[in-house]
């Protein structure tokens, strides 16, 4: 299902350094996190994004500007995660540039869902996920069950909800699925059914337990976690 678009790299890690994100992954995660949180258009230009990410990592913004430019123009925009939100007028510089203005960026619907899988955003990512899931139309009964189920997990088991969405976004980032939005039950099932077999087995087992057995399981997890 892959096409000519370059896949987003937000989960890419070095093969020789376990779980350490590549420079491209760090930049793209930084761009998405910045656009998810920052409201001012003036602070969502390429230069402002470069400044924000550079400050966080203690480096010069000039050293990552070209990477930011490339990530936006060659990856995040073509993949449908980011779009140009408009242009800001310039009072100085070349006349042509003043007339054209400087672009600022924003997350698309797909981008909001991708952002909910990025830990750097903190608690806001669950709020973003909840906002997106709430907006899903109930066309089919299975989609309604999916929507209400994820909303319940966000409130009661946010870590599990996060795992489900992260696995889904990971499949998108590796090109296993071409589009992640709109989210529907069939598409979600095709990606995560094998990834949550352990949780499903546990939940189905607990449902069938007697009250004293449920209490034992609860105590067991308290002891080992």
PLM regions with names:
Residues 1-44:
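Short alpha-helical segments that sit at the start of domains
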Residues 8-16, 55, 64-66, 92:
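N-terminal pre-domain segments used for targeting or regulation
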Residues 23, 59-86:
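Short amphipathic alpha-helical interaction segments
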Residues 41-62:
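Short acidic, hydrophobic short linear motifs in intrinsically disordered regions
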Residues 65-73, 94, 154-162:
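Compact, well-ordered interaction domains used in eukaryotic information-processing assemblies
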Residues 80-98:
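Beta-hairpin "wing" of winged helix-turn-helix
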Residues 96-132:
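Short, amphipathic alpha-helical interaction segments positioned at domain boundaries
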Residues 124-222:
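Exposed, interaction-prone assembly regions rather than primary DNA-binding/catalytic cores
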């Amino acid at each position: 299902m892959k096409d000519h678009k370059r896949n987003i790299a937000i989960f890419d890690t070095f093969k020789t350094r376990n779980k350490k994100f590549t420079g491209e992954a760090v930049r793209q995660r930084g761009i998405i996190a910045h656009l998810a949180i920052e409201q001012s258009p003036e602070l969502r230009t390429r230069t402002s994004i470069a400044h924000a990410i550079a400050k966080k990592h203690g480096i010069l913004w000039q050293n990552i500007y070209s990477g930011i430019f490339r990530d936006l123009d060659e990856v995040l925009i073509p993949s449908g995660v980011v779009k140009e939100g408009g242009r800001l007028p310039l009072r100085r510089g070349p006349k042509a540039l003043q007339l054209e203005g400087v672009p600022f960026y924003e997350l698309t619907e797909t981008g909001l869902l991708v952002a909910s899988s990025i830990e750097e955003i903190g608690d806001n990512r669950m709020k973003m996920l909840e906002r997106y899931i709430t907006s899903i139309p109930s066309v089919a009964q299975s989609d309604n069950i999916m929507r209400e189920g994820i909303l319940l997990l966000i409130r009661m088991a946010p870590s599990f909800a996060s795992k489900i969405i992260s696995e889904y976004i990971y499949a998108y980032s590796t090109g296993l699925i071409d589009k992640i939005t709109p989210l529907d039950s069939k598409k979600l099932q095709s990606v995560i059914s094998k990834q949550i077999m352990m949780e499903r087995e546990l939940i189905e087992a607990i449902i069938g337990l007697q009250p004293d057995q449920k209490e034992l399981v609860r105590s067991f997890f308290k002891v080992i976690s």
